[in-house]
Amino acid sequence: PEHPEDWVINYGYFITPSDVDISLDLMKQYGVKPEFECFAMTDLHYVRRLINKGWTDPTGGPNWVSFVYTTGSNWNLPEFMDMLKQVCPRNTLLNIIATGTQQFPILTEALIHGFNVRVGMEDNVYLGKGKKADSNAQLVEKVMQIAKLIERPIANCEQARAMLGLGAPRKFEWKD
């Protein structure tokens, strides 16, 4: 296609409550830490219900919840992020993901509010208006510069694993 936006496939994604139960049971069985991705407040309330009915993270660490701001979202950021802090389930580490042209302003607001952020080409391919990134590293570097400007500490790998309650990396063994 002539324009990158023509490459996007218009589709929907859904997961049923029984799919969630099966997935969570398998994660518990294998000690996998789930990431709950929320696209709306109703998703966050659903995660809270799962936690309140007794589902706990098999790693023993905090629940990892990502809230996704998509292109076209029109929330008033400071007030909305304040509300996220109030409605987040207990024992939760909140991560903000933003897509499209407003990624860096949204992630900056998230950092100011004390949230963790995700950045990468899965979510956005631009460093700024009309300037494409050549790599994920460029996007990470930009968000690191923003964090440094607002004096927000940046976790290294070991610190991030500790925050998530993951402990030391496990060695993968292929089983037939």
Which role fits each region the language model picked out?
Residues F36-E37, I150-Q159:
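Flexible, glycine/charged-enriched surface loops at secondary-structure junctions
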Residues A40-L44, Q159-L166:
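A glycine-rich phosphate-binding loop feature that marks nucleotide/adenosyl-phosphate handling sites
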Residues P1-E122, K132-A133, Q138:
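Catalytic alpha/beta core domains of metabolic enzymes, predominantly
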Residues K129-I154:
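C-terminal helical cap(s) of enzyme catalytic domains, especially alpha/beta-barrels
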Residues N124-Y126:
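A short, flexible beta-alpha/helix-coil linker loop
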Residues E158, G165-D176:
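C-terminal accessory extensions appended to soluble enzyme cores
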